[in-house]
């Protein structure tokens, strides 16, 4: 049975893990790193670059490099490249495809099944978009699970007894805080809250804004209008943020950042940890609201928290650690987990649970936001309250607002506001064919069904006629089935193009190596190669060099074969010469040995003569 992987599809970085012998293992990518930047770029030749290679070329290819696309999941955002529109699902699928390839290279087998994690506070539309991304990448998404739940599973699996765990998850682009009860193989989420637009990217942006302001006041030039300069500033800001986690001061030095009439200008600033914390204090403040809301929703006090687990690279910032310590009444956050990897490890464990490889583990997750419909007066009527354990199903009876109303429109929302329009609209559908009747008479049963992925199915049924209409809510930004199928085909085409490009690069590299090696052999063995063989080989080499100047891969292959055949003749000639030389040497050596024997006899007798006289 093929193994399933666990994937943490992050805003900034992504990680893939797998169970080996019952133990979770983080899989290193093709570049040897355990995390892969969630960056996708389109090279000028159309090649799709993913990960570190895409991140490295971002400065010189700003317009065609996409990062932090997770922040656009579940929206109608698109990027236009080479005459094509790419959705967040497609861009995420490129990242997932790379993780899939790296896992297959590591395991030596095809990978199709995966558990993918999402922020706990992701809406239905964002969850569905993540599932679609997996499908486009050629993955069968076994389950979408919440990142804090996954982290708690990884953290507590080997521990004994029951405990209440607070997971504080601050990633590159999203923030969640969750309270979970764990024990006896059960991981139960009590409450969750968060902010899907708060993360390390915002800390970076605060530093970028500060640098732009400083440079403007010093030089009178606004760098925010220069896309290439802004990309360099973003990279420098991220580096400075990371350095300030272990140092109290860092230098930001960017030579030739721009130019004025007088010549090139350089950026050189010092940033202290204290100044960095002042610049970003408003961001830290935004994490407090969700924390207090979770404590309130779970109905516990801070002193009932047994363990605090920090998740996400942004929790390495000292100010974040200090704040968590302060909020939890002085509790020391656990240092035993890797904040970058723990979510993927938990996802691999959940994949093992679903495949039957891990026994006696049960995840009880919750829906992060209330679900309901719009009723008369624009009121949001909740059918399922937030923090309800999933999977779940709830029904309620509604009626018509007008006499002889032939249909009702069901507008589905997700959120906490009392007025429907202020919440996130997930979808709309109509129940038609209601028989004429006075208002208030028809009975329409609306049922919400949330599956274990947190994805919603809504059914409206006229109890009088038995007529029913249902829809799987996938959000206003959801992709139609035919679009997903088209994107799957396109992803496969890109993968095929990439495979061809890799083959072409290998063919070209092998050909160049063959030229070098063959010329080296000729130069080192000039006297041993017959003139006709030498001329034939040089002619073949000239043909290969000419082919390498062009782009016809078949011509390069054909020319390489000719050089290889000619090289074999060189090898035969050298081998033949060596054999003749060694044969002659062996004959000469035999004569020498015979002569030595005769000499030895004479020399041996000489002393006897001397001794007798």
UniProtKB/Swiss-Prot annotation:
Inducing or repressing factors: By stress conditions e.g. heat shock.
Keyword Plastid tagged: no
InterPro entries tied to this protein: ATPase_NBD, Chaperone_DnaK, Heat_shock_70_CS, HSP70_C_sf, HSP70_peptide-bd_sf, Hsp_70_fam
Biased composition regions of type Basic and acidic residues, renumbered to the chain: 495-509, 521-535
Acidic residues: compositionally biased ranges: 593-604
GO terms of molecular function: ATP binding; ATP-dependent protein folding chaperone; unfolded protein binding
Keywords for the protein's UniProt record, in alphabetical order: ATP-binding, Chaperone, Nucleotide-binding, Phosphoprotein, Stress response
A Pfam cross-reference name: HSP70
Region annotation Disordered: where it falls in the sequence: 495-535, 575-613
Domain of life: Bacteria
Keyword match Cytoplasm: no
Annotated Low complexity bias: 575-592
Sites of Phosphothreonine modification: 174
Family under the similarity heading: Belongs to the heat shock protein 70 family.
PANTHER family (alphabetical): HEAT SHOCK PROTEIN 70KDA (PTHR19375)
Role noted for this protein: Acts as a chaperone.
Designated name of the protein: Chaperone protein DnaK
Source organism of this protein record: Thermobifida fusca (strain YX)
């Amino acid at each position: 049975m093929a193994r399933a992987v666990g994937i943490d599809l992050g805003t900034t970085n992504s990680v893939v893990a797998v169970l080996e012998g019952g133990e979770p293992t983080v899989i290193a990518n093709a570049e040897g790193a355990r995390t892969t930047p969630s960056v996708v770029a389109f090279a000028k030749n159309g090649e799709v670059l993913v990960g570190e290679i895409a991140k490295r070329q971002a400065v010189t290819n700003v317009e065609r490099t996409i990062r932090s696309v997770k922040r656009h999941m579940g929206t109608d955002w698109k990027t236009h490249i080479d005459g094509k529109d790419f959705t967040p699902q497609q861009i995420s699928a490129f990242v997932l495809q790379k993780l899939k390839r790296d896992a297959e290279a590591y395991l030596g087998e095809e990978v199709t099944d995966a558990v993918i994690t999402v922020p706990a506070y992701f809406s239905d539309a964002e969850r569905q978009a993540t599932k679609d991304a997996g499908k486009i990448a050629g993955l069968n998404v076994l389950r979408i699970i919440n990142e804090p739940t996954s982290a708690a599973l990884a953290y507590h699996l080997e521990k004994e007894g029951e405990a209440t765990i607070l997971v504080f998850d601050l990633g590159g682009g999203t923030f969640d805080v969750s309270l979970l009860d764990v024990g006896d193989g059960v991981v139960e989420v009590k409450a969750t809250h968060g902010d899907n637009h708060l993360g390390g990217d915002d800390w970076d942006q605060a530093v970028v804004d500060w640098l732009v302001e400083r440079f403007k006041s010093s030089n009178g030039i606004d760098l925010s209008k220069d896309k290439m300069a802004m990309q360099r500033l973003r990279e420098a800001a991220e580096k400075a943020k990371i350095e300030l986690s272990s140092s109290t001061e860092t230098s930001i030095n960017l030579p030739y950042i721009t130019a004025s009439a007088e010549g090139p200008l350089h950026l050189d600033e010092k940033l202290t940890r204290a100044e960095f914390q002042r610049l970003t204090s408003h961001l830290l403040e935004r994490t407090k609201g969700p924390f207090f809301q979770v404590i309130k929703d779970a109905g516990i006090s801070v002193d009932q928290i047994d363990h605090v687990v920090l998740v996400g690279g942004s929790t390495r910032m000292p100010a974040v650690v200090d704040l968590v310590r302060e909020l939890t009444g002085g509790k020391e956050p656990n240092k035993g987990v890797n904040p970058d990897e723990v979510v993927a490890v938990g996802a691999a464990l959940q994949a093992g649970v679903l495949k039957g490889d891990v026994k006696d583990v049960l995840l009880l997750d919750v829906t992060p936001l209330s679900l309901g419909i719009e009723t008369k007066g624009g009121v949001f009527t909740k059918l399922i309250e937030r923090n309800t354990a999933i999977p779940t199903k709830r029904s309620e009876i509604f009626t018509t607002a007008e006499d002889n109303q032939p249909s009702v429109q069901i507008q589905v929302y997700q959120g906490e506001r009392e007025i429907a329009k202020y919440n996130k609209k997930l979808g709309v559908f109509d129940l038609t064919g209601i028989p004429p009747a006075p208002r208030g008479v028809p009975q329409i049963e609306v049922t919400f069904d949330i599956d274990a992925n947190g994805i919603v199915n809504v059914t409206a049924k006229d109890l009088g006629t038995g007529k029913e209409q249902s829809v799987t809510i996938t959000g206003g930004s959801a992709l139609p089935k035919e679009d997903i199928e088209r994107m799957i085909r396109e992803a496969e085409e890109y993968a095929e193009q990439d495979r061809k490009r890799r083959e072409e690069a290998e063919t070209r590299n092998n050909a160049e190596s063959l030229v070098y090696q063959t010329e080296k052999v000729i130069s080192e063995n000039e006297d041993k190669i017959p003139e006709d063989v030498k001329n034939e080989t040089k002619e073949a080499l000239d043909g290969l060099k000419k082919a390498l100047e062009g782009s016809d891969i078949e011509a390069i292959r054909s020319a390489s074969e000719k050089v290889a055949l000619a090289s074999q003749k060189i090898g035969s000639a050298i081998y033949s010469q060596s054999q003749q030389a060694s044969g002659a040497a062996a004959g000469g050596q035999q004569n020498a040995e015979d002569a030595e024997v005769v000499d030895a006899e004479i020399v041996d007798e000489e002393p006897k003569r001397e001794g007798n006289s």
